[in-house]
Swiss-Prot record:
Upper taxonomic lineage: Bacteria, Bacillati, Bacillota, Bacilli, Bacillales
Entry coiled-coil feature ranges: none
Swiss-Prot/TrEMBL keywords: Carbohydrate metabolism, Glucose metabolism, Hydrolase
Protein family per UniProt: Belongs to the cycloisomerase 2 family.
Protein name per Swiss-Prot or TrEMBL: 6-phosphogluconolactonase
Keyword RNA-binding appears in the UniProt entry: no
Gene name per UniProt: pgl
Native organism: Bacillus subtilis (strain 168)
Metabolic or biological pathway, per its Swiss-Prot or TrEMBL entry: Carbohydrate degradation; pentose phosphate pathway; D-ribulose 5-phosphate from D-glucose 6-phosphate (oxidative stage): step 2/3
InterPro entries tied to this protein: Cycloisomerase_2, Haem_d1_sf, Lactonase_7-beta_prop, WD40/YVTN_repeat-like_dom_sf
Gene Ontology cellular component terms for the protein in this record: cytosol
Catalysed conversion reaction: 6-phospho-D-glucono-1,5-lactone + H2O = 6-phospho-D-gluconate + H(+)
Annotated Gene3D superfamilies: YVTN repeat-like/Quinoprotein amine dehydrogenase (2.130.10.10)
EC number annotated for this UniProt entry: 3.1.1.31
Length: 349
């Protein structure tokens, strides 16, 4: 029997109390009922370090926002609070940690900033040592100011990448001794509203999910210069769909053959096959997430399964994934959790 532990970040309203844990049984092809793993205010995004020993979560508390650190029991999935670092103002929306477990990054949608938190030997966090603040605005009504939605590391860890929905830009930074220094930027079409980026694991490609235009943008990435070049833009929703829909999560499979994205409003997962020579995407299929407003999804460590989290209907939905074709098959395993907005597995097979 093979079971994998996962975590769900939530908005703490409507009965939600914080971070929940669950298990995927790959033999039974079923999810366990989620249980509360940590009481925390608005843990809307979580990340685990490479060794699966520490979980970092966004936190909102009493007019402050920041990051909380937890020690992970890899056998039970239980979380033990280590510490947190809070800053006055709204909470961030995205958190990531480098492979060496030296720095945690947060992106703040409300302030348009990226913060850098040094990690101590036990995995706990020091107060932030630097920040990067964006400026500008875009043409869409939601682009009245910068809205940084993602901050993470490039695959070779040469750069930090920040994606800003409010100003249609991607920034690259050098990070040395905890200090961010801007290296360059890449602009997207006005009003696109870029949200998240995912890198190809083998080739020099990256893929950006836009929230406002609900598109996937394929980029060529130069890891030496930290520069990007646009090679393709594809819609993630059908051309004849006219209702409101917003792009959310994007992930590339470990073999680099497929890109998956979630569409909130159309309420679907779209699958694209990657041309390994050009980086361009070819549409494969869209499947319903069997719920409303899929904020996130995740592959299990074998990538034979996909779990989607529907925020408005409060459910996790399980799919089996065909590794050859990329296609998804809905499984009869759906579990409830209030306002799920982020889902992650411990990523070690």
């Amino acid at each position: 029997m093979t079971k994998y532990i996962g975590y769900v970040g939530t908005y703490t309203k409507g009965g939600s109390e914080g971070i929940y844990s669950f298990e995927l049984d790959t033999e039974k092809k079923a999810l366990s009922e989620p249980k509360l793993a940590a009481k925390l205010g608005n843990p809307t995004y979580v990340a685990t370090n490479k060794n699966n020993t520490i979980l970092y979560s966004i936190e909102k508390a009493d007019g402050q926002g920041g990051v909380a650190a937890y020690q992970i029991d890899k056998n039970s999935g239980e979380l033990t609070f280590l510490n947190h670092q809070l800053i006055d103002g709204p909470s961030p929306c995205h958190v990531s940690v480098d492979d060496q477990n030296q720095f945690v990054l947060t992106a703040n949608y409300h302030s348009g900033k990226v913060h850098v938190f040094p990690v101590q030997e036990d995995g706990s966090l020091q107060s932030p040592v630097s920040e990067a603040a964006h400026t500008g605005k875009g043409p869409h009504e939601r682009q009245e100011k910068p809205h940084t939605h993602y901050a993470g590391f490039t695959p070779e860890h040469n750069y930090v990448v920040a994606v800003d929905l409010g100003i249609d830009k991607l920034y690259t930074y050098k990070l040395k001794d905890g200090v961010l220094t801007e290296s360059g930027s890449h602009s997207f079409a006005p009003g696109a509203g870029p949200r998240h980026i995912a890198f190809h694991p083998k080739e020099k490609y990256a893929y950006v999910m836009t929230e406002l235009s609900n598109e996937v943008i394929a980029l060529e990435y130069n890891p030496t210069a930290g520069e990007f070049r646009e090679i393709q833009v594809v819609s993630a929703i059908p051309d004849d769909f006219t209702d409101n829909s917003q792009g959310s999560a994007i992930h590339v499979t470990q073999d680099g053959r497929f890109v998956y994205v979630a569409n909130r409003g159309h309420d679907s997962i779209a699958v694209f096959e990657v041309n390994q020579y050009s980086g361009e995407l070819a549409f494969v299929e869209r499947v319903s997430t069997e719920g409303n407003w899929p904020r996130d999804f995740v592959f299990d460590p074998t990538e034979g399964f996909l779990v989607a989290s529907n925020e408005e209907t409060g459910n996790l939905v399980l799919f089996e994934r065909d590794k050859e074709t990329g296609r998804l098959t809905l499984l009869p395993s759906t579990v409830s959790v209030p306002y799920p907005v982020c889902v992650k597995f411990l990523h070690q097979v």
